[in-house]
Amino acid sequence: MHFQVILMMMWLWLEAEGGTCPTLYKRYSKHHTYCLHPNSTCKILTRGVSSGDKEIILREHNKLRSRVATGKETKYSLPKASDMMQLVWDDELASVAQKHADQCVFEHDCNDCRNVQNFGVGQNLHLRTSSAKFSDITWAGAVNGWYDEVKDFNKRQISGFIDGKGPPQTGHFTQAVWATSWRVGCGRSMFKDGNTFKDLYTCNYGPGGNMKNAIIYTKGKPCSGCPLNSCCGKACGGISYDGLCKMSGNTAPQYSPPKGFAFRCTFNGESDCATTTSGAKKWKTIKTLSGSFIGIVLNPGESSTLSFTVPFGVSDGSMCVESYYRKGPQVAGQVAAGNAVEKFGDPADPSFDYSTPLKESTDFMQFGVTLGWNTKTTLSVVFSVPPGTAPQYLEMKDISVRKGEC
C-alpha cells in the first residue's frame, strides 16, 4: 500500500495551533463556530466548564440513558435498548461548544459549523434568564430538562426518527438518548443582555443523532448489541452504568462484519483494501472515532488513481457496488472543481473500461452502481483537479460488493 496511515488526535493538534482556525474547519464551513471570536455586543461575566461540571454532565446523561436502556422508563413505557452507549467526555466537542456559548445567542449553529473530523455533531441548548445575576450553575437541570421531553415522545420514532422540532418539541430528548452518540463536550457562558442576566448551556454530541429515518436505539436485551471492543455496565469497573456499552481509549466502536459480501473494505486492514496508486501519491488512511476512511487533497493540475488490486465477482446475475464518499473544495465557499470517477475493469481484458462519475457532496454520501455482469472485476478511483482552480479533496469509506441490484 502506497499511502500513509494517520491516527486522528485532533484535539492535541488544536492545542498546538492555539487560536488559529484549523484547515479542516475551514473546509467544513466559512463560518465554523470554533473560528468565531466571542460576541462583542454581549458582556460575558463567567464562562467555561469545570472538572466538577464535567462529572455532573456525564453522570446525568448516563443515568438517564441507563434508565432507558434497562427498561426503567416505566412512566412512559419505553422498551429496553440493546446498543445504548455510555457517554464519555470529548475535549474537541467541548471546545467548539464553548465557542458557541460565547456567541450569546440561543440558537443552534449550522450542522457544518460545528462538524469535526471524527464525526458529524449533534447539539442541545439550554437558556435561563433572570433580573439578578445567577449564583449557581445548573447542568443537572439542563440535562434533565432535555430528557423531560420524553413525556411528549412518540415511541414509534424509536425505529425511525422523523422529527424532533414539534410541536411538541422532543429533539433534545432524542439526542440525549441517541444510542450511538458516545462522546459529549459542553460549554457555558453567563452574560448580561440589557438589564437581563442570561445563562447559556451548549452540549455537542458525536456522532450526532436526530438523523431522519435512522434508528434512535435498537430494542432488545441491554448490552446485547454492544461494540466488540466495549464492556457492559458493572463488568467495566470504574464509573459505569447498567445497560450501557462503555468504550475505553480513543478507538472507534467495532461491530461484527455483516455477511454476504463478495468484497468489503472499511480501511481497517482488510485484505480487500490492498491498493496501488499512480499519479500524485498523496492518499492517506485516516483513523477516526467513527471509523476509518481514505482520502487525498490535490492541488490544481494534479491527478491520482487509487486501484484496488483484489478483483471481485459473484456466482451469477448482477452485482451491486456501494461506497460512501465526500468531495469538494479544501476551503468552504470556493468552487467545487474536482473530477472523481469510479472505473471498473476486467483483469482478462485490458481494453474493457466502464466508468461512472461521483457527484459533489460535502457529507459522506452513499453511492451505488449496479453492474450487469458477474465476472471478475477490478475497481479504480480516478481523481483530478483542473489547472486554474482551487485545491480539492476526496474521501471514501466502506466500499462493498454484493450479489444483486443496488
From Swiss-Prot:
Where do the record's glycosylation annotations fall on this chain? N39
Q: In which tissues is it expressed?
A: Expressed by the venom gland.
Signal peptide limits = 1-18
What Pfam families does this protein map onto? CAP
- Give the similarity note: Belongs to the CRISP family.
Q: Which InterPro entries match?
A: Allrgn_V5/Tpx1_CS, CAP_dom, CAP_sf, CRISP-related, V5_allergen-like
Q: Does the keyword Ribosomal protein apply?
A: no
Question: What organism is this sequence from?
Answer: Trittame loki
Record's comment on post-translational modification? Contains 9 disulfide bonds.
Q: What is this protein called?
A: CRISP/Allergen/PR-1
Sorted keywords for this record are: Disulfide bond, Glycoprotein, Secreted, Signal
Places the protein is found: Secreted
